[in-house]
């Protein structure tokens, strides 16, 4: 509007330059997402194990790949059996931009993934190559139907409610992975490589350490 007024001769050059020099009001918003606490992860996984069902074993493995390897929801559902290297205990996925990356599993992550693979590999014949499949009635693995992204979202939501854990998104598991890497003293470039990011600025947004410390700090204030 100001430019049009200046162009039409309704305001003089001095007024126009004054208006141009005024900077817009800057603001910020609280970033979305969070990193799950270790006790929350323990509750979720324990709840899965306590069921003593194939669904529980499968879901525990999904939790571990999300928080222990930083896999996106799409990467989890599209993970294929030939992407799992049992010798090196590594998992290979195709991420955003058709970029392939290899992630080494920790002992804990591998233990949970192996438990699921033990049952999954018993039903390889005439099936899809996906690691994670639909399970009927708790015990029947349907190798013709891969797990979907929406099914993973619903599973996490239900598990959180059943375990009395604060609601979180599938991507929060990925944020948890990045935050744990930072907590272990890894530099941002190492975290970026493991996350499959192109930009280190993107990786830094996944670091939730300062946010959690800031929130906890206010709880320690004694007003009176």
Predicted ranges, named:
Residues 1-224:
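Conserved catalytic core of the tyrosine transesterase superfamily
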């Amino acid at each position: 509007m100001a430019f049009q007024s200046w162009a039409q001769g309704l305001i003089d050059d001095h007024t126009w330059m004054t208006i141009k020099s005024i900077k817009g009001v800057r603001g910020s918003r609280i970033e979305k997402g969070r990193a799950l606490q270790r006790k929350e992860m323990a509750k979720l996984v324990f709840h899965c194990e306590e069921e003593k069902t194939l669904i529980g074993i499968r879901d525990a493995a999904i939790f571990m790949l999300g928080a222990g390897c930083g896999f996106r929801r799409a990467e989890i559902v599209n993970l294929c059996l030939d992407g799992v290297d049992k010798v090196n205990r590594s998992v290979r996925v195709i991420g955003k931009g058709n970029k392939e990356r290899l992630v080494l599993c920790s002992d804990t992550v591998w233990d949970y993934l192996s438990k699921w693979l033990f049952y999954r590999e018993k039903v390889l014949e005439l099936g899809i190559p996906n690691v994670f499949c639909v399970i009927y009635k708790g015990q029947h693995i349907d190798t013709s139907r891969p797990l979907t992204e929406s099914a993973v979202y619903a599973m996490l939501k239900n598990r959180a409610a059943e375990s009395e854990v604060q609601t979180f998104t599938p991507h929060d598991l990925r944020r948890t992975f990045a935050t744990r890497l930072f907590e272990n003293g890894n530099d941002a470039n190492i975290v970026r490589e493991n996350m499959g990011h192109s930009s280190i600025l993107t990786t830094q947004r996944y670091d939730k350490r300062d946010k959690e410390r800031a929130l906890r700090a206010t709880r320690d204030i004694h007003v009176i």
